[in-house]
């Protein structure tokens, strides 16, 4: 049986670069992987870039492979939910501190049931049709346990996120594939109470004592969990 390729999907304001350290760990273990750049967060993104556009990009990348495991971080979880029904050889979904909206919910709406304000909320700034992040607060929200060198580098990579992508509702139905949720207990971006709600929508869950970005702060431990999930 062919080993699956791990298709890594970043969250808001990110890019394929967020998987730098986890990708190195997967490569070291001879695990095939690829990472997607979502169109809602690329430089020069069109303001009318929606969740469906991000999902379409994921499906294109995934369907160029054989069997795949989709791995989504933060907003990337919403993208996985939207893309999954169009991925031909999907084996499993893995969510990392991610949003798992129900049918008809947007990424933004999926967290409203839990009234929990985070450092990320304080960091967000509106710039026309985009959201940007104030750097000092973004570091605390996203990278507080990643080490200064990594965190400061990551801050230079962040890009504006289209508001449309976060506000557009999920339109695809659930798929018949197991799902695995990784909760991050020290997260300053997606409150743990939100993660617990999202994890309850998945088949299984595990926990890391990490901030929002374990792909940087503890890539080996995260890799262990992702591979154990399959």
Regions found by a protein language model. Give the residues of each.
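Active-site signature of alpha/beta-hydrolase-fold catalytic machinery across serine-
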Residues: 21, 82-83
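Flexible "cap/lid" loop of the alpha/beta hydrolase fold
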Residues: 85-90, 94-132, 162-166, 190-191, ...
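Active-site loop/oxyanion-hole signature of alpha/beta-hydrolase fold enzymes
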Residues: 35-69, 85, 108-112
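Conserved serine/cysteine hydrolase catalytic core
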Residues: 159-224
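Gly/Ala-rich beta-loop-alpha elbow adjacent to hydrolase catalytic centers
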Residues: 71-76, 80
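Conserved HGGG/HGGXW glycine-rich cap/lid loop of the alpha/beta-hydrolase fold
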Residues: 3-43, 89
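Conserved alpha/beta-hydrolase catalytic His-Asp/Glu region
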Residues: 127-173
